[in-house]
C-alpha cells in the first residue's frame, strides 16, 4: 500500500501489534456507508499509539477509495487564536478533500495554507467548482473576523459538503482535548473559549 499521509511512526513496517484495533475501526468506517456507525473516541494515555492508528486509518481509507472520504486533523497543543485555528482547520480539510477527489497526494502538503484565492483557483482547476462558494464564505468571515459565523461555517464544512455532494466524510480529530486552548476575541483582549468541542463529530 502507498502512504498518502506521512506517518510519524517512521517506516510503515514499524506499525505492529494493532491488528485488532485496525480491524475494529476499519469495520466501523465501512459501516458508515450504511449509516450504522456513530461518533467514537479513542482514549488512552499519551504515547500509546492513538495518532499512529488514525494516520494509518487515513492512509488505508484514502487508497481504498471505497465511498468514504477521510479527513485527519491534529489540534495543536499551543494556544491559538480562534480565527487562525479555523483557517488552519479549513485549509487542511479542503486540501485533503481535493487530494482525495483528484488522487493527487501532493495536495496533502500544500505550499501555502493562507491564500484563499489560490485555494479557490485550485478547486476550479480540478473541476471542483462547487467548493468555491464555501471558500469565499470562509475567506469573508476571516477577513472581517466574524468569529461566530466563521466557527460555524468551518465546523460544519465537512458535513455541508458531504450533504450537498451526497458523499460520506470521515472526520478524525487528533488531540481534541487541546480545543480548550483555542482563544477568542480580538488580539488585544483574548478570553479562553469554553465548551466548544462541538467541532468533533
Residue ranges of each PLM-predicted region?
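Short, N-terminal intrinsically disordered low-complexity segments that are rich in Pro/Gly
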Residues: 11-15, 144, 189
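Substrate-engagement module of ASCE P-loop NTPases
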Residues: 157-162, 191-201
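Soluble or luminal CAZymes and related metallo-dependent hydrolases
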Residues: 17-21, 146-154, 195-198
